[in-house]
A protein has these predicted regions:
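Surface-exposed interaction/gating patches
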Residues: 1-19, 28-29, 37, 99-107
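Short, solvent-exposed beta-strand edge segments and adjacent coil->beta transition regions
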Residues: 3-5, 48-52
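Short hydrophobic/aromatic beta-strand micro-patches
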Residues: 9, 54-56
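An amphipathic, aromatic/His-enriched active-site/gating alpha helix that lines ligand/cofactor pockets
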Residues: 16-38, 47, 56-95
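Short beta-strand micro-motifs enriched in acidic
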Residues: 42-43
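Flexible, glycine-rich phosphate/dinucleotide-binding loops
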Residues: 46-47, 103
Length: 107
């Protein structure tokens, strides 16, 4: 099992609009291909303009296959275009992580 930890910085003051756009246009196609996220969070303290999503995959090949299918989905491409035009996101980072043997998530 791997966990894809994706961190996005949102323009100050644009978090509500970013969450609304994703909920209306991005959530359905993304979860259709990747399954539900382990978590979809936004910070309440510190760098408050930050979103973090966690997606679980069997392995790197599973992640690559599912993400390729998502990228080929016209509905996801429409969301990406709208997100780019809106310009709410400043940057993104991702890390592939492996849970410790004692982590409370199923491996």
């Amino acid at each position: 099992m791997i966990v894809d930890v994706r961190t996005y910085r949102v323009r100050p003051g644009k978090m509500p609009q970013e969450l609304d756009l994703y909920a209306k246009r991005g959530l359905a196609p993304q979860t259709r291909h990747l399954g539900p996220p382990l978590a979809y969070l936004h910070r309440e303290s510190g760098d408050i303009n930050t979103l973090v999503h966690l997606w679980v995959f069997e392995d790197a090949a599973d992640r690559a296959s599912k993400r390729a299918a998502m990228m080929a989905d016209p509905e996801w491409q429409t969301y990406l275009k709208l997100a780019d035009e809106a310009g709410f996101l400043v940057d993104q980072r991702n890390s592939l992580m492996v849970p410790a043997s004692f982590a409370p998530i199923k491996r």
